[in-house]
Amino acid sequence: MISPDKRYEADTNLYNPSEIEKKWQSIWTENNLYKTDELTENSDKFYALSMFPYPSGNLHMGHVRNYVITDLIARFQRFKGKSVLHPMGWDAFGLPAENAAIERGISPSVWTKKNISHMKSQLKLLGLSVDWDREFATCDENYYIWTQYLFLELYKSGLVYQKESEVNWDPIDNTVLANEQVDSEGKSWRSGAVVEKKLLKQWFLRITNYADELLKDLEKLDNWPERVKIMQDNWIGKSIGANINFNINTNPEKNITVFTTRPDTLFGVTYLAISVNHSLIKKITDQETIQDIENLKQYLKDNKNNELEKIGIKTSLIAINPVNSEPIPIWVASYVLDEYGTGAVMGVPAHDLRDFEFAKKNNIDIKQVIVKDKSEQSNELDNAYVENGYLINSNHYNGLANTIAKLKIAEEGVNNGWAENKIQYRLRDWLISRQRYWGCPIPIVNCKKCGAVPLNQSDLPVSLPKDIEISANKINALGNNNDWINTTCPKCGIGARKETDTMDTFMCSSWYFLRYPSSKCSTKPFEKNEINKWLPVDQYVGGVEHAILHLLYARFFTKALRDNELFDIDEPFKKLLTQGMVQSAAYKNNKTGKYVSPSDITDLSNPTDPIDNSKLEVLFEKMSKSKYNGIDPESVIKKYGADTARMFILFKAPPEKDLEWGDTDVEGQFRFLSRIWKLYINCAKNINSKSNSHPDKEKSLIKSMNIAIKEISNDILNNQFNTAISELMKFYNSLSNSINDINNNLKIDALKTFCILLAPFAPHIAEEIWHLIGFKKSVHLEHWPSFNAEALKEDSYELVIQVNGKVRDKVNINNDMSEDQIKELTLKRPNILKWTQDKEIRKIIIVKGKIMNIVV
């Protein structure tokens, strides 16, 4: 890299980040400093990736934290001699862009590209070491052609299918949502609307085919946060049990199947509960019961976001328990879900808390079949007994441990035809159909003769129409665009219609990390050999909110495409860091529930509402417009510089914890960089002048420098960036205190080392001060320093002296003392003579550097 023609020469010693940062960003771009090196057989690779952003139009502090963390890691690995791939792109399709475009009466394409341009310029202000040559947006036709290509690959392998299904319908965004996109309150993750149910013909991916592998391979992900793995484990929701068939007494040929993980409790079943939509409902003829069920359906619809009462409706239907032939009443219950298991569950009130509550409320028998101790008998229970124990009231299984009985009873059922061993998953197939314009078109043609026909890969891409109508509240759906929709069937050649649904945006983000290693490839989504070289991603950084959606889908895609022999990797992300939120002070009036802008508050140290003079509560919450607590990164960079923003973000809190914004802390980092600047300015003026050499100060500085190298290296590897900066500050203090009392060679070595250690954190000032002290090539092309273990050794150590195993004294010993010298020194000490005088010393054991034991 070429040094700038004219070095920045300040008239004063003041640190001027805006000029420094602008200059070096330009030079780095001109010199392609961060272009990815080609991988060779002898080079080590490191793939550093942030979850790519949705181009909303403006960078926020959450973005800054994400990308600065990844950039630090990428820079460090580059210093360590790795070939680093650190790309950036845009997750550009989706409802927010479409809705924003509708509001403004412009095309989503125009809106999105404008936002990308603005956000890219903001990102560049941070001085990221990104290889921008590999940039793409998922809405680019030369990207989504390959999303369509991969859809067809999955179709060929039987992982894509279409069916009519009751789906989650967002009435605000007018589109279907996957189960994962509906929150625990039954609301859309995007719009916040209460989700409705609707019957539509939809496209699905068979993610359930990979449920077991997705679950088992979580064990391979040693460098993922435990909470993310637990969230995926729970979402996949594997249950090992059995399907039990209960005959219906009025029709022995008809049975009801119930999934259970507790066959050991079958003798305690006192009722069966079915959902309001179970097929057996049709067998009910009593009009009053039918009306009660309809009322319950309405209640469930009206209260789907609230905690439900345990409502039960007893039917005239009776099931027969296969283990003892006892009749069991069938109830319709509010708590039984259609979508889990078979839509029917067995009620064991004595050994299930929910069933116990339901039975008590509806006067249903409670039969205890498990006790804690073999000697116990059944008693009236105050609550359900849910622990392990021994069977009672269970015929020939009495006395067996329930864990063994569980297997034995299931085995009996399998042998006699009334049970089937079953593994059940909570995970459901991935619904990918969306009824909106701004998404990747599905490469399917609907033919009256042939049905749904996949396009040939040579017919791709299916492009979005550009001549779209935008009204006050919607973009004209693809199905209403006759010029676009009409086509011919690729199978029979007659007139047909294109599929009018677009894909869920998670389809685009489930494989984007595979595109970067060969982003310019024009004949396929990616080069197999490049994927096998660069993948998995060595460090992935993003929010924990993507634990179930994006991260699970990306793992599924990777495994499915591997099985199509497109590459050889099993998991996409080797190491995952989920950064915490960036929070800022918000001022809330608890009387009105409204937030007040800090600009409207006269005294922030004692905030009151300017309208009613109420005292305001100060809360640190996630930055948002509605709470008036957003901090504009661009204004911070303009005032303090990107390096200060980076240092604050990295220093304020551990990366996985939430970070509270504080102007005082930002100013503290600016002052630290200013002190560094002043030190190097002064050193640059007399870099070659001789200093008075003080051996003690030199030795101390060498030790401080090597401690810094060791600790900062370990801290970065362990994602402890805040403590790394603390070590950097300690090294700076040692350097500044001794700079005039050390020999010139050590001075240059220490200044050089400090500069390299600073560079991943604050790359602009590090580059500038590097050149100020006379170096020509970029500091970012240097090698990371190695620490000298010898320099960390102490001159002396504390020796613990024992007599017959009891501590009697402690003494400082020089490292170079021999064992004889240690004995001579210690045996004369009064505290030792007190215990050894006039006694025979039988043995002396010395563990050098630690302990000495005298046996008398």
UniProtKB/Swiss-Prot annotation:
Motif window: 'KMSKS' region: 622-626
Enzymatic class: ligase
Which superkingdom does the taxonomy of this entry point to? Answer: Bacteria
Taken from the UniProt entry, a GO cellular component term is:
cytosol
PROSITE patterns annotated for this entry? AA_TRNA_LIGASE_I
Q: Which InterPro entries match?
A: aa-tRNA-synth_I_CS, aa-tRNA-synth_Ia, Leu-tRNA-ligase, Leu_tRNA-synth_edit, M/V/L/I-tRNA-synth_anticd-bd, Methionyl/Leucyl_tRNA_Synth, Rossmann-like_a/b/a_fold, tRNAsynth_Ia_anticodon-bd
SUPFAM superfamilies assigned: Anticodon-binding domain of a subclass of class I aminoacyl-tRNA synthetases, Nucleotidylyl transferase, ValRS/IleRS/LeuRS editing domain
Q: What does the record give as the reaction this protein catalyses?
A: tRNA(Leu) + L-leucine + ATP = L-leucyl-tRNA(Leu) + AMP + diphosphate
Q: Does the keyword Aminoacyl-tRNA synthetase apply?
A: yes
Keyword NADP included in the entry's annotation = no
Which residues are recorded as binding ATP?
625
Which CDD domains does the UniProt entry name for this protein?
Anticodon_Ia_Leu_BEm, LeuRS_core
Gene Ontology biological-process annotations: leucyl-tRNA aminoacylation
Q: Where is this motif: 'HIGH' region?
A: 53-63
**Which keywords does UniProt give here?**
Aminoacyl-tRNA synthetase, ATP-binding, Cytoplasm, Ligase, Nucleotide-binding, Protein biosynthesis
GO MF annotation, one = aminoacyl-tRNA deacylase activity
Q: Where in the cell is it found?
A: Cytoplasm
In the record, the note on similarity to other proteins reads: Belongs to the class-I aminoacyl-tRNA synthetase family.
* Matches recorded under NCBIfam families: leuS_bact
- What is the protein's given name? Leucine--tRNA ligase
Q: Organism source for this protein? A: Prochlorococcus marinus (strain AS9601)
Task: Recite the lineage of the species.
Answer: Bacteria, Bacillati, Cyanobacteriota, Cyanophyceae, Synechococcales
Identify the gene encoding this protein: leuS
